[in-house]
Amino acid sequence: RRKHFAGNAGSAGPSAPAAPAFQTEPFRWKRWQRWAVGTGCALAAYSAAGFWLVPYVIKDQLPKFAEKELARQASIADVRFNPFTLRLEADQIAFREASSANNAPLLSIGALAVQLEWKSIVRRAWSLAEIRITAPQAHLTITPDGKFNLAEVLATWQRNHPEKSEGGMPRLVIAHFALEQGKVDWQDQKAGYADNFTPINFTLDNISTLPDANGSYSLSADAARGGKLHWRGTASLSPIRGEGELILNDASLPGLAAYLK
């Protein structure tokens, strides 16, 4: 006996609801978002170039510059630059003779600080709020054959950079220049005379290469053999002119006279 079952397919049970359809719209950058991202990327690149690239380039290029242009050795311990305040700082800068067996020192600087101003952009001149040189030391030597080490350095520079008649001085404005606790070692090996001058302090205010801009200066130095030098006045770089007074106190004239002979 056969049994036939008839039924409605829809009566098997309730059907599962259909999944809702989601449509994803492409993300669109708003204008302020594009500006924010672009500004952030530009600031990041500028910061990286200032905080890292500038010090790296200076430390890398200074020895190469000294070797190529001056035929001397140079070193620098540390360089820091803030791209937002435009302040450059460096420590332990040294220049030495390259040909001598003991690499005789020429010039060393304990610390250097340079403060550039943003108004250089609109002023069309390099505007420096401050240049400060701390603990510089110069070693001036006349060899037994009569060669002056500083003159040799200048002669090397002039050979690599012959004078050109065209062009003038760069547009430069320095609000304050200071040299602190300087020292000069003087040694004349030909005459058998040696002396040193320390401390040397020098300040220069409002000096400029712009036309008819006058600045003031002050210099003081003490000699180990006796004597105090004071020099102050005003100066201009364009045109080159100056006036002031020079005072020498407690100088050791017998020792100096013997050397000058």
Question: What are these regions, as identified by a protein language model?
Answer:
Residues R1-G7, F22, P26, D91-N206, ...:
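Secondary-structure transition motifs
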Residues A9-S15, A21:
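Intrinsic, low-complexity polybasic segments
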Residues E25-A42:
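N-terminal Sec-pathway targeting helices
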Residues L43-D145, T209, G226-R241, A251, ...:
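Terminal hydrophobic membrane-targeting helix
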Residues A66, W186, L219-D222:
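Short acidic-hydrophobic surface loop/beta-edge motif
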Residues N102-A104, A191-A224, W231-P239, I247-N249, ...:
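Beta-propeller and related beta-repeat scaffolds in trafficking/envelope systems
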Residues G244:
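Active-site-adjacent "gating/activation" loops or surface patches in catalytic cores
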